[in-house]
Amino acid sequence: MKIGITGAEGTIGSVLRKGLSNKYKISSFTLKNQDFESIQMDLSNNNEIQGKFEGLDALIHLAADPRPEASWESVKKNNIEATFNVYNEVKKAGVKKIIFASTNHTQHGDTLLTTPETLDLQKSKILSLENNTNPDSLYAVSKLFGEDLGKYFSEQYKIKFIGLRIGWIVKEDDPTVMCGTPSEDYLRSMYLSHRDCIQVFERALESSRNYLIAYAISNNSRKVFDLKETSRALNFNPEDNSENYFMNMK
């Protein structure tokens, strides 16, 4: 299978380029020149992406402004206009599947403490995919747009679509990097390890579902997302738990 990865220079992109390379032929798409082979283009510029996805079987769309505090101007350009351009080019190129990097922030609006990367433990509760969305930022709003646009392209153009509401993956692959900070509780809940990240994207690539929204977090003791439906739909069985890292600190 030939797959493309937009935003291949980011943390998740770097994990997937390495973790999926033994099984898939990967084309990397980046905004700027990198120290690895990639095709440079601005996804918000429709002219730059024309023809770039030809020959792909699936596209993993990671590229975005990932900051919860991102301005509307940036969100509109990098997360909304770019995502439409990507999906539209996927359609033109005959790509059969989109894996979209959505976010946990789509359901975090009433449980943040002070900022989108904090968690109010008094309001924390187990949420499922059946619960209403509650975006905590314009960034999260843009990801809901990506999910809904994916539904449109799935229904109207028969492109398979899986949106992964991703937790928090850190470059160090160790949630204790936030120990003692205001974001510690949030990361303990939302942690996604590198190997669990690779597994959930691989399961998404292998899935035959026409349209699916799923969670992408590790099996954390403090998780706030119910993984049962995701595990059933994708055969995703995360191996890691953020609490194990903190226990090893003692």
Task: Show the residue positions of the predicted features.
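Active-site helix of classical SDR
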Residues: 138-145
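NAD(P)H-binding glycine-rich loop region in Rossmannoid oxidoreductase-like domains
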Residues: 41-78
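Conserved C-terminal active-site "lid" loop/helix of NAD(P)H-dependent oxidoreductases
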Residues: 178-179, 213-237
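Rossmann-fold cofactor-recognition segment
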Residues: 31-45
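Conserved Rossmann-fold NAD(P)-dependent oxidoreductase catalytic core, especially the SDR/UDP-sugar
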Residues: 87-136
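Substrate-positioning beta->alpha
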Residues: 141, 162-166, 180-203
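Conserved beta-loop-beta element that borders a ligand/cofactor-binding pocket
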Residues: 147-171
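N-terminal Rossmann NAD(P)H-binding glycine-rich loop of SDR-like oxidoreductase domains
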Residues: 3-21
